[in-house]
From Swiss-Prot:
The gene is sufS. NCBIfam families: PRK09295.1 (NF006791), sufS (TIGR01979). It comes from the Bacteria. The active site is at C364 (cysteine persulfide intermediate). This is Cysteine desulfurase. It comes from Enterobacter sp. (strain 638).
Amino acid sequence: MSFPVEKVRADFPVLTREVNGLPLAYLDSAASAQKPNQVIDAEMEFYRHGYAAVHRGIHTLSAEATQRMENVRTQVAAFLNARSAEELVFVRGTTEGINLVANSWGNAQVHAGDNIVITQMEHHANIVPWQMLCERSGAQLRVIPLNVDGTLQLEQLDALLDARTRLVAITQISNVLGTANPVAEIIAKAHQAGAKVLVDGAQAVMHHTIDVQALDCDFYVFSGHKLYGPTGIGVLYVKEDILQAMPPWEGGGSMIATVSLTQGTTYAKAPWRFEAGTPNTGGIIGLGAAIDYVSTLGLDAIAEYEASLMRYALAEMASVPDLTLYGPDARKGVIAFNLGKHHAYDVGSFLDNYGVAVRTGHHCAMPLMAFYQVPAMCRASLVMYNTTEEVDRLVTGLKRIHHLLG
């Protein structure tokens, strides 16, 4: 049975837009995905008919909103195959989730003489918090280097791991190169060395099924807005024994058990002690609707369609003169490229004139740009609502730019 891409596209109202007099070809979902009507409607319905502050409310609307929020926590647990919903913390997104780990678990567990291992392909969100932790603690930051083809030099991992390695933090799929890292293998090696592992799943959850128990990762984090959900909501998964031992990061309402000016404060159990203040309940409701949406389509069917679309795109882009592609042949979700000696911003601006939206810049991955010795790249994203016709428009646009600019 073929993937119902036209039916899917009909659920995304923005895809009916025109840009510069041409139909929008939105190839920027790796930055942020568009939202289907089902997500938009779910959040609107909540604000129109069901909104109230969650926790401790005796009235019906508050109790209902609290229950709906906790139902989504249970839903996310099933989506990730977590053992318990109490292993999941609602955060603003991947960046906040990583910072939470660095500032709670990291401050308690990482000390002078210890080390943290990351990779050369990481998003800044999975670099800077660890740099800051190392500066605070006196720990060392170690880096798994890249190969030119965009894969990791995994043969270097054994030499980087030792008895003082506290954490390996790695992206599951590169936001620039589309490299799908062998995270299960890396997790197993890290655990043999006694280290914990954090997986940045921001570029993975929309492309295929995630099973945190099978991966055996200690931390897993993703953002809702890349999963066709709202902005400002994400999820941090932490193995229950680790999460219950972590000290709170932010103080305020909802994360306490008792507060006394003379006796001090006691804290709620996890995950609620990591959710200070009024949560983004509307965003949580929207995230639940997004998970419903992709689950109904089936992540296996989505993965199969996207893999076919990627093969088509790579074959067609091979016909563009002076086009440099970055990353491995086997990639997921994104294609990074430059056209001749033209700056990525110029290429992206021309493509926008043709109604084709791509991302340009360093993609929050400046160490990766330094490795390839370029200031910027263009990046086209391919997801479940994209089509071969949109790929054709990208290729035609690139050929036209090459002809115009030489």
